[in-house]
């Protein structure tokens, strides 16, 4: 069945609902590429199925099994020769012919050199799919795995800290941990323990592993603060007499990576020209090579060169964050299964399915409009405050609901106590959320506003002064974003500004 032409008829309503589907892509990590497209991945001499002229050179990074990971030294998109879908099918079918004629050892080397593994029922060997599936068009890299899962960020930050230690600043891990501890993240991020990634014996573990070991979400949360630390602290070490050497090349390489990450994140909220992303990626790769050479560039560095093409094809950059979080549900129920039997998998599947059906049956399961999350009737004290602030009549009290959390766009929510940016005339202003409420069904947020003291746009760093005893109420959809902030000793507030608002 070709769903792009015939669709599928679903039995809803009197006449039913017909859905058509066109395959957009497979968002995958490297391991999934091996299962679906039979790529040999990082262990192959030719580690990218999409590039015909890219082969490995031995790296200095040793994997846990003792084998050398591969490095990539092609740093420009224009220097790559792109493979076609027909090229991939020819390779798969060439292996199909050779498997019956080549000795096992020779066939293994052939697969290694071509970057593809032969499997009897491989997707690329299914002739029926030739007219429906274009592998090159639907082959996608997941930027989350590329950058944050033993990826580009983990290696680059590790190498930067090692460079700082070599020039004489031996306590950089401890100082960085203390610096992170001064910052606060939006409630949804759970950033209170991020400083622990670099504290205590974690330093030894990172250095033994030759990369920073942390969860992908934690790595993403750290990018902004780490960038400011590099700009304000590491780039000034020699000038302040703390080191004899200089590590500016390494610092600028990390900052170039941070720019790439900021562009990727911003692409989900604002239009981003693919060329802009490609330019930033190529700049980072060149600066990384200047700082540390190509020997540390694993295939995930090469993945970055393909991201702009994915943005061009789909108009956005998909990632696996939400898919990875889905692992929590089966883990939650699998932990409680004590009787390992032939039906334990079925039991687990039933538990997970019931869990998801329970979530889907909730009335707000697909509620993405602006408004309160799990709102409830406001207390009398809250009613009195809002009636006074909004100059309402006493009859409005019955319509007032409140919550500590509210959705301000289809993409995000914010909590009471979060520092936010909100629309103010032609620009934006910062403030802290005091309460979220609804009055006559209209979502409203009470804000303690800040006045701008200083804004360093290139750094994305700003200083604000809280306005004392002056709260304002805004419609919740006027909130632009939640931000990372730090409360300074003099009462001012340091705020990191997202790239799209600089």
Where in the sequence are the language-model features?
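Terminal interaction-prone segments of large eukaryotic proteins
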Residues: 178, 182-502
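Charged (Asp/Glu and Lys/Arg) segments that form or flank catalytic channels of large polymer-
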Residues: 2-232
């Amino acid at each position: 069945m070709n769903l792009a032409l015939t669709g599928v008829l679903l039995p809803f309503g009197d006449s039913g609902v017909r859905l058509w589907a066109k395959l957009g892509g497979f968002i995958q990590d490297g391991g999934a590429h091996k299962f679906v497209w039979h790529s040999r991945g990082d262990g192959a001499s030719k580690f990218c199925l999409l590039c015909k002229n890219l082969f490995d050179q031995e790296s200095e990074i040793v994997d846990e099994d003792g084998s050398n990971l591969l490095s990539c030294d092609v740093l420009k998109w224009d220097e790559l020769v792109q493979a076609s879908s027909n090229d991939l099918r020819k390779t798969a079918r060439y292996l199909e012919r050779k498997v019956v004629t080549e000795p096992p050892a020779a066939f293994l080397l052939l697969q290694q050199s071509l970057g593809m593994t032969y499997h009897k029922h491989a997707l690329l060997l299914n002739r029926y799919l030739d007219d429906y599936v274009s592998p090159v068009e639907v082959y996608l890299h997941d930027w989350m795995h590329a950058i944050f899962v033993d990826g580009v960020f983990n290696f680059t930050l590790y190498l930067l800290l090692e460079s700082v230690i070599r020039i004489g600043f031996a306590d950089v891990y401890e100082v960085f941990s203390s610096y992170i501890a001064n910052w606060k993240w939006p409630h949804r991020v759970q950033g209170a323990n991020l400083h622990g990634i670099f504290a205590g014996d974690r330093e030894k573990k990172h250095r033994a592993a030759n990369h920073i070991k942390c969860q992908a979400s934690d790595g993403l949360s750290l990018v902004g603060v780490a960038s400011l630390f590099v700009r304000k602290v590491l780039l000034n070490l020699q000038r302040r007499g703390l080191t004899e050497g200089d590590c500016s090349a390494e610092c600028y390489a990390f900052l170039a990576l941070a720019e790439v990450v900021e562009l990727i994140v911003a692409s989900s909220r604002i239009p981003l020209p693919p060329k802009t992303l490609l330019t930033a990626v190529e700049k980072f790769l060149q600066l990384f090579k200047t700082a540390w050479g190509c020997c540390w560039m694993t295939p995930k560095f090469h993945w970055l060169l393909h991201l702009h093409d994915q943005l061009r094809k789909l108009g956005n950059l998909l990632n696996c964050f939400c898919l990875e979080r889905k692992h929590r549900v089966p883990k939650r129920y699998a932990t409680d299964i004590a009787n390992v039997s032939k039906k334990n998998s079925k039991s687990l599947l039933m538990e997970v399915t019931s869990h998801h059906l329970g979530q889907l049956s909730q009335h707000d399961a697909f509620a993405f409009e602006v408004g309160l999350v799990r709102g409830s009737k406001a207390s009398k004290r809250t009613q009195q405050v809002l009636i006074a602030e909004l100059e309402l009549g006493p009859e409005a009290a019955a319509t007032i609901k409140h919550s500590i959390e509210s959705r301000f766009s289809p993409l995000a929510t914010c909590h009471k106590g979060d520092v936010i940016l909100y629309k103010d005339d032609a620009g934006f202003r910062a403030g802290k959320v005091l309460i979220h409420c609804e009055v006559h069904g209209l979502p409203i947020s009470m804000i303690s506003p800040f006045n701008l003291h200083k804004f360093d746009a290139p750094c994305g760093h700003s200083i604000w002064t809280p306005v004392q005893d002056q709260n304002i109420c805004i419609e919740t959809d006027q909130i632009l974003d939640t931000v990372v902030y730090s409360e300074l000793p003099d009462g001012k507030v340091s705020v990191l500004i997202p790239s799209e608002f600089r």
